Swiss-Prot record:
CDD domains from the UniProt entry: TrmD-like
Stated family: Belongs to the RNA methyltransferase TrmD family.
Keywords: Cytoplasm, Methyltransferase, S-adenosyl-L-methionine, Transferase, tRNA processing
Catalytic activity reported: guanosine(37) in tRNA + S-adenosyl-L-methionine = N(1)-methylguanosine(37) in tRNA + S-adenosyl-L-homocysteine + H(+)
Chain sites annotated for binding S-adenosyl-L-methionine: G113, I133, G134, D135, F136, V137, L138
Gene3D superfamilies in the record: 3.40.1280.10, tRNA(m1g37)methyltransferase, domain 2
HAMAP family in the record: TrmD (MF_00605)
Gene expressing this chain: trmD
Function of the molecule: Specifically methylates guanosine-37 in various tRNAs.
Name this protein carries in UniProt: tRNA (guanine-N(1)-)-methyltransferase
Enzyme Commission code(s) on record: 2.1.1.228
Biological processes annotated in GO: tRNA N1-guanine methylation
Amino acid sequence: MKIDFLTLFPEMFEGVLGSSILQKAQEKDAVQFQVVNFREYSDNKHNTVDDYPYGGGAGMVLKPQPVFDAVEDLTSKAAAAPRIILVCPQGERFTQKKAEQLAKEEHLLFICGHYEGYDERIREHLVTDEISIGDFVLTGGELPAMMIADSVVRLLPGVLGKEASHIEDSFSTGLLEHPHYTRPADYKGLKVPETLLSGNHAKIEEWRNKESIRRTYLRRPDLLKDHPLTEQQRKWISEWEKE
């Protein structure tokens, strides 16, 4: 997979793309990152990329020219047409399902803006996806783009050490993940559940399943509405409702 980032602040990406899973993914040739400063595509001598909005109002708006030229340059060199993603508060809410969908693509291109917003022609004529990471406002699109990229890249074949790791993650199954424990079994009187120490794999799997359902029921009950529950899982929920 290839992932391009169009940004005015390329230095923001250095630490994230050069660390942890994203770095390992590059070393394994699972992904190739390219960070491009679209200010370099500005066609005026001052390299400005923003201007005042027509009709007045506060803030500055990203001009279409540098963004259009940058996207056209990158796509002209691409082996496959990329998904062009605009990260913005008005976009589709990002979910694990969306990450899985994007992980099947060959090429992603993120447009990371700053200032008040984008010229609407960017949104209407360049973008294939508009994605939001939540109902809040950030200074720019760089952090959301990196978060989305991280979520997507870890799903690529061979990136994680244990292939089942991402399948067991919260949301991959439609539920929140069960609790995890490691050594020591007793830390300052805080003990690991006996079931996990029993060596009985069937009991351990049942415990994890139950705790996953419990955690989802308590913290994100909305996720259970569309989740196909077994008879046993329904019994557990019925018991908790009586508590």
